[in-house]
Swiss-Prot record:
TibA-mediated aggregation is blocked upon capsule expression and fimbriation and is sensitive to pH extremes. Glycans are attached at residues 74, 86, 93-94, 97, 100, 112-113, 116, 119, 124, 131-132, 135, 151, 154, 162, 170, 176, 181, 188-189, 200, 226-227, 230, 238, 248, 263-264, 275, 294, 305, 313, 322. Residues 110-123, 136-146 have a biased composition (Polar residues). It is a multi-pass membrane protein. Homohexamer. Pfam families: AIDA, Autotransporter, ESPR, Pertactin. Residues 124-135, 639-667 have a biased composition (Low complexity). Mediates both adhesion to and invasion of human intestine epithelial cells. Also mediates bacterial cell aggregation via intercellular TibA-TibA interaction. Enhances biofilm formation. This is Autotransporter adhesin/invasin TibA. It comes from Escherichia coli O78:H11 (strain H10407 / ETEC). Residues 1-54 form the signal peptide.
């Protein structure tokens, strides 16, 4: 480089000094230089030849508008406090140095080839280029300023402030840079940085070909390593973060609050995660040889991978079964591959998610660890939960052993199912939702388990000193039994229910409005055949209900056996069948206690056992079911289906209305002798099922006779309305009949129906004959005195003939067939619904004769006599509670005599005949047989005399059309009909 020097006299030193032609400040002024030109030339001639001397520049300003736009420093040249403005350039090379240079917008400082720059300040728009052996030390890069280090250049101690940038590229290097908030350091294409400190808000970008070593990331400082970039020995402190986007990192140390994020294509090797630090691996990210110390955390997302992981005690792994993870922990080797996790250790924030179709085997869930099993995920081997370890998931399938270790205080809400087992050793757990473990539940070492609003199906094995609590509506189905140490205690409260699935043993059982159910529930697998179940207790206290089963027919049933004291109040809700006991009246024990003041009562007060009802009896400290033996009372007269005892004077008296009361042979097997004598011996009370059968056996007779009664009014006025050549008629009828019966078999029969027919009338010499056919239908609702509502659907038809003459005589005959479709509905004493459907055929008829007399011009009288007969065929029926009944042929034979008094009026030109009627009827049938369970015979006696009273009116609207209406009241030994009504019409051809 060509340089021009001046030789000037320095008065202060008394010597000649060689200076650059650019020197002004601090030297002689230009006019003084001109005065010494001659002296200089002389000196040049006189002095010997010598090399050029180094130049020193202080406080120079270069750039556009200045005397000089550039400054070149080399070979020992120095410059201090230089200001480089827009367009100005300073070149520092070959031993030149610049100190405290200020580079403003548009200014450039080039440091290369052995040049050096110290303490430069790069402001907005200013640039410093360090290359080819140049070096820059302690540079400050401010907002908008840029330092570029490349091609062998180096920078040390650069401070990059907010908005400033440092680029280290193409063989450049930077050491000990400090990147502050908002500042950036870019490293790429062979650039190397070391010991960079990235502070709050600062950013370091390591790109393709760049490398960063010993970087320290402080609060919110970030290091971004993209594809082809590498970072080594990075230290990540609290709030700092390293992001690997295809780049690689080795030897990273992550401290409390620090984070490393490894994304797609990124890799990290030999990372150490200290307490509070976290390494996060995303899809297609890969880490290897990560060491997790106590309190540190490795999180691997689905599609990410981590290998050769060292999980120290207290270290946490957060991952799922769609990741690939392997390494060692306190329990040995662990791995996740192909949707299968093996030997995972989850503690101190560790979390494993098992996805649908995936599985986890031999998982250890420690304090603050979580195992999350999604629907379709499966647990195998031994899954262990300790301390505050948690199992979560909407649907968890356990095919292994789910083991809650001592001191576990875990809670579970969701569905836990599978063929595995659940073991709790010590601790206090709580389960809600749904639980089903085919392998059973094992409660050990003083453990306490609470089932809170849980639907559970599992057999439970307890040890002495353990406690199982059912609370808040829990339903448990399964056996509970002890082991060789004894049986644990149990509490059933808060409307909870325990369904026993077989014989069970409990230490101390406490009921707090809970229910223990011996019956098979919808979730059990018990066979339809009855199997008695026993519950053995050490002691019993509280209040609640025991729902039990008995089969008195085979003299067997469930047993509650309390070895110690029993105290409190308990209800026995006992179900039995309609089957007949082999040995009638033998007591059946249902409760045994070792002592105490416990009180047991029978729900409903009774239990059905085939034909008879049984009650609860106490003997010493034990309780038995025994056949009732109360005295008989008067039968009911006002049954009510909605309240079986309403209007029933024998309510609370179990044998009221028993026709065999006082008859020792009545109802005995095979006697068939209901009237074998009298006795003062107490009798048993029939069940509601028997009473319903007895009542339904008589219903066809009452239905048929009611229809036949209404049929006799088909003509209205037989002589006036029945005219040749004939006609058609129709009639609606409705009635409400209260029917008493033996053995409390009374009922209310409500009938609604119609009849319609047609006939032809033949005129004889002094009389007429009507011959016709008809069809009838009625719906008959039966409300049993002791509860239940049955129905008889009756349809039929027949033939009739009526003869009458001009003197007022008439004879009327009817033949009728009926089909009865019977639906029996009642319930047992325990509330179990009972039903049985069957059909019967019935045949019958009536014959009536009478005469109409004129009392005066308008009044008339019509006496008559009438007889009816009916027979329904016998029927074998079976109820759904197992009861059988043989209904014999039901017969009815009645005779009736009556009188109608009326008058004939002319109303608006129409003939109207109001009338009153009275009659007395007697039923002769008193021996209709019914046999129950092939054992007990009953006699339905429907005989008795009945008074009938009515009023009606016939109106002849036209010569060929008439209408009529009638209302009647009936009262007799067996029946009372407060009102029976009918309306009809006839049209003659």
């Amino acid at each position: 480089m060509n340089k021009v020097y001046n030789t000037v006299w320095n008065e202060s030193t008394g010597t000649w000094v060689v200076t650059s032609e650019l020197t002004r400040k601090g030297g002689l002024r230009p006019r003084q230089i001109k005065r010494t030109v001659l002296a200089g030339l002389i000196a040049g001639l006189l002095m010997p030849s010598m090399p050029a001397l180094a130049a020193a520049y202080d406080n120079q300003t270069i750039g556009r508008g200045e005397t000089s736009k550039s400054m070149h420093l080399s070979a020992g040249d120095t410059a201090k406090n230089t200001t480089i403005n827009s367009g100005g350039k300073q070149y520092v090379s070959s031993g030149g140095s610049a100190t405290s240079t200020t580079i403003n917008i548009g200014g450039v400082q080039h440091v290369s080839s052995g040049g050096s720059a110290t303490s430069s300040t790069i402001n907005s728009g200013g640039h410093q280029h360090v290359s080819s052996g140049g070096s820059a030390t302690n540079t400050t890069v401010n907002n908008g300023g840029r330092q570029t280090v490349f091609s062998g250049g180096s920078a040390m101690g650069t401070i990059i402030n907010s908005g400033g940038d440092q680029y280290v590229i193409s063989g450049g290097s930077a050491t000990s840079a400090s990147v502050t908030s908002g500042a950036r350091q870019f490293v790429s294409s062979g650039g190397i940085v070391k010991a960079t400190s990235v502070n709050s808000g600062g950013r370091q970008y390591v790109r393709d070909g760049g490398s960063a070593t010993d970087t320290v990331l402080n609060n919110t400082g970030r290091q971004f390593v993209s594809s082809g970039g590498s970072a080594a020995k990075t230290t990540i402190n609290s709030g700092g973060g390293m992001y690997l986007y295809g780049g690689s990192a080795t030897g990273t140390s992550i401290y409390n609050g620090g984070r490393q994020y490894v994304s797609s294509g990124g890799s990290a090797t030999n990372t150490t995660v200290y307490s509070g630090g976290r390494q996060h691996v995303y899809i297609d990210g890969n880490v290897t040889e990560t060491t997790i110390t106590s309190g540190g955390m490795l999180q691997v997302e689905a599609g990410g991978s981590a290998s050769k992981v060292i999980q120290n005690s207290g270290g946490a792994v957060i991952t799922n079964t769609s990741a690939a993870v392997s390494g060692t922990n306190d329990n040995g080797s662990f791995s996740i591959a192909g949707g299968s996790a093996v030997n995972m250790l989850l503690e101190n924030g560790g979390y494993l998610t098992v996805f649908d179709g995936h599985q986890a085997s031999d998982t250890m869930v420690g304090s603050d660890g979580t195992l999350d099993v999604r629907s379709g995920g499966v647990l195998y081997g031994t899954t262990t939960l300790t301390d505050k370890g948690a199992l979560v998931g909407d649907v968890v399938t356990n095919e292994g052993n789910l083991y809650y270790l001592n001191n576990s205080t875990a809670t579970f809400t969701g569905t836990l199912t599978g063929t595995g087992t659940l073991t709790q050793e010590g601790g206090n757990t709580r389960f809600s939702g749904l639980l089903s473990q085919d392998g059973g539940i094992f409660l050990q070492s003083g453990g306490a388990m609470t089932m809170d609003a849980l639907q559970a199906k599992a057999n439970v094995t307890t040890q002495s000193g353990t406690t199982l609590t059912l609370d808040n509506g829990t339903i448990l189905t399964g056996n509970v039994a002890g082991d060789s140490t004894g049986a644990g205690d149990m509490a059933v409260k808060g409307a909870s229910v325990w369904h026993l699935d077989g014989d069970s043993t409990v230490g101390a059982l406490t009921l707090d409005n809970g229910t223990v159910d011996f019956r098979p529930s919808t979730t059990t697998r018990m066979t339809p055949a009855f199997q008695a179940v026993s519950l053995a207790l050490g002691s019993l206290s509280g209040s609640g209900t025991f729902q039990m089963n008995t089969d008195i027919a085979s003299h067997t049933g469930d047993m509650l056996n309390v070895a110690g004291n029993a105290s409190g109040n308990f209800v026995l809700d006992i179900k039995n069948t309609g089957l007949e006991p082999v040995s009638a009246g033998a007591p059946l024990q249902v409760v045994q206690t070792g002592g105490g003041d416990a009180a047991f009562t029978l729900k409903g007060g009774k239990v059905d056992a085939g034909t008879w009802e049984y009650g609860l009896s106490k003997e010493n400290t034990n309780w038995y079911l025994k056949a009732d033996t109360p005295p008989p009372v008067t039968p009911p007269t006002n049954p009510d289906a909605d309240n079986p005892d309403a209007g029933n004077p024998d309510a609370g008296n179990p044998d009221a209305g028993n026709p065999d009361a006082g008859n020792p042979d009545a109802g005995k097997p095979g006697t068939g002798k209901p009237d074998a004598g009298t006795s003062s011996s107490p009798v048993r009370r029939t069940t509601k099922s028997v009473d319903a059968v007895l009542g339904m056996a008589t219903a066809p007779a009452y239905v048929f006779n009611s229809e036949l009664d209404n049929l006799r009014f088909r003509h209205g006025d037989v002589m006036q309305n029945t005219r040749a050549p004939g006609g058609v008629w129709g009639r609606y009828t409705g009635s409400d009949n209260r029917i008493s019966g033996g053995a409390s078999s009374g009922y209310t029969l409500t009938q609604n129906g119609f009849e319609t027919g047609a006939d032809m009338v033949f005129d004889l010499s002094d009389s007429s004959l009507a011959v016709g056919t008809f069809f009838s239908y009625s719906d008959n609702s039966i409300k049993h005195a002791r509860g239940g509502k049955s129905n008889v659907d009756s349809s039929g038809g027949g033939l009739y003939a009526t003869w009458f003459d001009n003197d007022g005589y008439y004879v009327d005959g009817v033949l009728k067939y009926n089909r009865f479709n019977n639906e029996l509905r009642t319930w047992m004493s325990d509330g179990t619904a009972v039903k049985g459907d069957y059909s019967q055929n019935g045949f019958g008829g009536s014959l009536e004769a009478g005469r109409t007399f004129s009392l005066n011009e308008n009044a008339w009288a019509q006496p008559y006599v009438r007889t009816t007969a009916f027979r329904a065929d016998k029927k074998e029926i079976r109820l759904n509670n197992g009861m059988k009944a043989s209904i014999g042929a039901t017969k009815s034979l009645q005779a009736e005599a009556g009188l109608k008094l009326g008058m004939t009026l002319d109303v608006a030109g129409k003939e109207v005949k109001p009338y009153l009627s009275a009659a007395v009827s007697h039923e002769f049938s008193d021996n209709n047989k019914v046999r129950i369970n092939d054992t007990y015979d009953f006699r339905n006696d429907i005989s008795g005399t009945t008074g009938k009273y009515g009023l009606g009116v016939n109106a002849q609207l036209t010569p060929n059309a008439g209408v009529w209406a009638e209302a009647r009241y009936e009262n007799g030994k067996q029946t009372e009909s407060p009102i029976t009504g009918g309306v009809g019409f006839r049209i003659n051809f």
